[in-house]
């Protein structure tokens, strides 16, 4: 038993020793491996260090070489710049030297010219003195004579050129205007009616006058109060005269009297009834006439106020010419002229029809010149275009025409108004206009006598030949014509004729 235990213990000891030995062997191998790994790592690290150092040295060498090359290039560039600067300095020096020489020559020539100029002035002064001694005139007198001569010759030459240009332009303008106007007038036919501010109503007998007057004048007072017209009952047999500046009220009075005379019942109540009925009739006529003229002229889109204003023109007259007929005629003429001149005929026709619309307003008198502005304001408030509004306002030159359409409206208006038989003037207006023409001519210096002839269509002026020569007579005619245009209003045109007579009388003995 002991032997067995001893054997086991001995075996255990032996096994432990063997294990220790084997462990030491393994430890030695591990140490050898560690040492080997350490050595290899150190070698590898050393190799990498050497490689890094070598690469760094190589990179530094490359950079150093590059820097050296850059430095050499910059040095070369600086050297080249210095060479160019030196060349420029040399060039500038040469130029400065040349300029200095040139300046010296210029200074020398200036001094030379100044000396020559001084000599010339001295000689000129000497010559002027000699000329003054020879001619007996001073320098200023001679200059005035030369200036007057040059001015006279220049005026004469300028007047010749102006006259020639005016003649050529007048011939061309007359031809074109005649062609257009002849073509226009051939295509228009209008009815003309002259009206007055006085109307008469025929009576069946003179007894009717008493009935119209009524007891204590009640009937005639009622008529005049309701209508606003003067009813004149005088010695005129079988007639009553109606006087009223407003043609609508005149027409109302005439129709009312005719209705009352035909009916035979004349008293204030009946008068009031008839006036009411006739007023409605006239309002209907105003509306119908306005719509009729718009339809006849094929004009669309007019405001109701404008149509009614046109209808009121049916009862109005200007210088005896019916204003609605005149407006319609002007529209037809304007449309034809617009087509001839390649303008918009619709716009021109519209403006021509409405050009006297201001006379259709109750606050404007028949021949008032303010109707143009008032009519333009009405047209603008009714939505008419700016061209139409300006044409209405400018047709009497109260404002400046801003379009060719406005000029055409003026021309068409003048053609309709100035043709023979279109208008009549009162005797006072006629005499005053002739007197005004003569007064304008007498306001100019040198006018001896003046005669307005041909119903004011021509002014013949006799001038003093000592004050007015041939050239001044042309200017005088132009100035008188301009003053007439500025201060007077008239249809058509007025001819200004200057007569200058030189009469020499000598007796043979």
UniProtKB/Swiss-Prot annotation:
Pfam families: HD, KH_1, RNase_Y_N. It is found in: Cell membrane. The chain crosses the membrane at residues 3-23. It comes from the Bacteria. Residues 197-257 form the KH domain. One of its GO terms (molecular function) is RNA endonuclease activity. Keywords: Cell membrane, Endonuclease, Hydrolase, Membrane, Nuclease, RNA-binding, Transmembrane, Transmembrane helix. Residues 323-418 form the HD domain. InterPro entries: HD/PDEase_dom, HD_domain, HDIG_dom, KH_dom, KH_dom_type_1, KH_dom_type_1_sf, Ribonuclease_Y, RNase_Y_N. One of its GO terms (cellular component) is plasma membrane. Belongs to the RNase Y family. Endoribonuclease that initiates mRNA decay. This is Ribonuclease Y. The gene is rny.
């Amino acid at each position: 038993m002991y032997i067995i235990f001893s054997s086991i213990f001995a075996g255990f000891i032996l096994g432990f020793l063997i294990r220790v030995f084997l462990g030491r062997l393994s430890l030695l191998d591990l140490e050898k491996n560690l040492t080997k790994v350490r050595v290899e790592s150190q070698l590898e690290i050393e190799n990498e260090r050497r490689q890094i150092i070598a690469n760094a040295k190589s990179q530094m060498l490359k950079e150093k070489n590059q820097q050296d090359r850059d430095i050499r290039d910059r040095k070369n560039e600086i050297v080249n710049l210095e060479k160019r600067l030196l060349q420029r300095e040399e060039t500038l020096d040469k130029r400065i030297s040349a300029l200095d020489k040139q300046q010296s020559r210029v200074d020398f020539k200036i001094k030379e010219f100044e000396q020559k100029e001084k000599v010339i002035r001295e000689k000129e002064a000497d010559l002027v003195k000699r000329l003054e001694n020879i001619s007996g005139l001073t320098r200023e007198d001679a200059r005035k004579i030369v200036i007057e001569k040059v001015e006279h010759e220049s005026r004469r030459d300028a007047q010749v050129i102006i006259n020639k240009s005016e003649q050529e332009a007048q011939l061309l303008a007359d031809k074109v205007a005649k062609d257009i106007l002849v073509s226009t007038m051939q295509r228009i036919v209008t009815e003309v009616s002259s009206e007055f501010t006085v109307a008469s109503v025929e009576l069946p007998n003179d007894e009717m006058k008493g009935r119209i007057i009524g007891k204590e004048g009640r009937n005639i007072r009622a008529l005049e109060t309701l209508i606003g017209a003067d009813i004149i009952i005088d010695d005129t047999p079988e007639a009553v005269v109606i006087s009223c500046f407003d043609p609508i009220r005149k027409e109302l009075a005439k129709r009312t009297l005719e209705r009352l005379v035909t009916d035979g019942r004349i008293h204030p109540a009946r008068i009031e009834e008839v006036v009411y009925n006739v007023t409605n009739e006239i309002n209907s006529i105003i509306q119908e006439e306005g719509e009729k003229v718009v339809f006849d002229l094929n004009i669309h889109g007019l405001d109701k106020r404008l149509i009614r204003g046109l209808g009121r023109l049916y009862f109005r007259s200007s210088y005896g010419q019916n204003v609605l007929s005149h407006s319609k005629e002007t529209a037809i003429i304007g449309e034809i002229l617009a087509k001839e001149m390649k303008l918009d005929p619709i716009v021109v026709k519209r403006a021509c029809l409405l050009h006297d619309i201001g006379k259709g307003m109750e606050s404007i008198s028949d021949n008032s010149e303010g109707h143009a502005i008032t009519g333009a304001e009405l047209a603008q408030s009714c939505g008419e275009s700016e061209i139409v509004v300006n044409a209405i306002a400018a047709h009497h030159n109260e404002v400046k025409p801003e379009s060719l359409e406005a000029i055409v409206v003026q021309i068409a208006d003048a053609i309709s108004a100035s043709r023979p038989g279109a208008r009549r003037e009162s005797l006072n207006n006629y005499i005053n206009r002739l007197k005004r023409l003569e007064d304008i001519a007498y306001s100019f210096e040198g006018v001896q006598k003046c005669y307005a002839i041909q119903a004011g269509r021509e002014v013949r002026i006799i001038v003093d030949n000592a004050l007015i020569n041939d050239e001044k007579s042309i200017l005088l005619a132009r100035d008188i014509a301009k003053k007439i245009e500025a201060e007077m209003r008239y249809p058509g045109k007025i001819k200004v004729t200057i007569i200058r007579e030189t009469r020499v009388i000598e007796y043979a003995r």
